[in-house]
Amino acid sequence: KVVIGVSGGLDSTLAFLSLCYMCDKYNIDRSNIIAITLPSGNNSSTTYNNAIDLMKKMNVTYSEINIKEAITRQLQEIGHDCQTKDVTYENVQARYRTFTLMNTANLKGAIVIGTSDMSEVALGWSTFNGDQMAMYGINAGLPKTVIKATTAYFKNIFPEVSDLIDSVIDTPISPELSG
């Protein structure tokens, strides 16, 4: 079993579709993919809807865990005003998502599949103990240009979600941590 956070963005979409492809290729039931979207209130409706629609249409085990209250509580506990959109505000979200994915993996006897790509790691666009941490980083060796091209290629493999793949590719790249 695998656990993956699906945001509706480019990196998580490629990682998610790769897992679906792997299941199909090796005759593994897609219910072994535990896909979770973790909105925080800073997500666009486009990425949120892309995530939900992808998970539904690909027939995986999926859920939504809204982390808005949890991150607000964490920010308050450390004395943050919850209004300043600084690095602390952003990183609490990434860390809480990873915390939730890791705990779900423990509960389900699964591993967490990371979605960070090589460009993000090389440029430092990741959160320590957040999105840079996983049990297997499926995108880790791929620069963003390859991520985009490979995601587009999956339209041929999964025509039932080609419209969603187009929407993901056309959406401006953003971590969506500040609203």
What is the predicted role of each segment?
Residues 4, 64, 113-115:
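General beta-strand structural signal in soluble alpha/beta enzymes
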Residues 16, 48-51, 98, 144:
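Amphipathic alpha-helical segments in well-structured domains
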Residues 19, 26, 31, 35, ...:
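Generic long, charged, amphipathic alpha-helical segments
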